[in-house]
Regions:
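N-terminal start-of-chain detector that recognizes signal peptides
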Residues: 9-11, 68-69
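Non-catalytic terminal regions with compositionally biased, polar/charged low complexity
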Residues: 195-196
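C-terminal capping/lid segments that line or modulate ligand- or cofactor-binding pockets
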Residues: 14-60, 76, 82-190
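Short amphipathic alpha-helical coiled-coil/interface segments
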Residues: 1-10, 113-116
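An acidic, gly/pro-interrupted, aromatic-rich
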Residues: 66-75, 80
Length: 196
C-alpha cells in the first residue's frame, strides 16, 4: 500500500522523477537524490524507474564527474555548496546504489560505485581524509568549514566498489563477481535455521 501511494502521489510525470509535494498539492521544484529512494523500497514502476535513470547522467541535474549532488546542479541552492545544499553525501550515494541494484540497473550501479570510489580516493590520496561530504564540482572535501574530515559513513563510498566485486547479504549469502560467471554461496544458515 505504501509503495503504491509513493508511486501514484510523489511521481512528477512532467519531469520524470519523484518529488516532494507542497502543502497545497503541487510539486516542490527542488530535487535531491532522495528522488531515487523509491527504487530502494520497490515503489517505482518499471516505466518510472527507467525515466529516473535519465537524471543520473543529466549534467543539469545529478550527472557529472562528481555525483550525486544533494541539490540538482540547476538549482540555485547548488551554488551554496554548504552541507545539504549541493554537497555529495556518502550515505545518500549508497542508498541510491542499493536502489539501482534492486531494480537490476547493474551498469548504472557500477558506474555510481566507480565514481563514488574515485571521489573517496581523490581525497584519501591527497589528504588522507575520509570526509563527511564533498564538493560536487571539484570533489574537494575541506573547501568549506563545516565538513568533518573523518566521518564513518565516508567508508560507504569504497564499500560500493567492493560490493561490485564481493557481496554478502543475509538472504542469498555470498556472491563473488569477476569477469567470468558469478560464484554464489548460500543461502545462509543461522542458529534459527536457513535464512529465506
Amino acid at each position: 500500500r505504501h509503495r503504491t501511494l509513493i508511486s501514484e502521489t510523489l511521481w512528477d510525470e512532467s519531469r520524470g522523477i519523484f518529488a516532494n509535494r507542497q502543502r497545497r498539492g503541487g510539486f516542490v521544484r527542488s530535487l535531491s537524490p532522495t528522488s531515487f529512494y523509491p527504487l530502494l523500497c520497490g515503489a517505482a514502476t518499471p516505466a518510472q524507474a527507467a525515466r529516473l535513470l535519465e537524471h543520473l547522467s543529466d549534467e543539469t541535474t545529478f550527472g557529472g564527474d562528481f555525483v550525486l549532488p544533494n541539490a540538482t546542479r540547476d538549482d540555485p541552492a547548488f551554488a551554496d555548496n554548504v552541507y545539504w545544499r549541493g554537497r555529495i553525501w556518502p550515505n545518500v550515494n549508497y542508498m541510491v546504489w542499493l536502489g539501482l541494484r534492486r531494480y537490476g540497473f547493474t551498469a548504472e550501479a557500477s558506474k555510481l560505485a566507480g565514481q563514488s570510489y574515485d571521489l573517496f580516493m581523490k581525497n584519501w590520496r591527497e589528504d588522507r581524509i575520509a570526509s563527511e561530504n564533498y564538493n560536487a564540482v571539484t570533489g574537494e572535501a575541506l573547501d568549506q568549514g563545516d565538513t568533518d574530515p573523518f566521518y564513518i559513513w565516508a567508508a560507504m563510498l569504497p564499500l560500493m566498489a567492493t560490493g561490485e566485486i564481493v557481496e554478502f547479504d543475509l538472504w542469498t549469502g555470498w556472491t563473488v563477481r569477476n569477469t567470468g560467471r558469478d560464484l554464489a554461496l548460500g543461502p545462509m544458515l543461522s542458529p534459527s535455521g536457513t535464512l529465506h
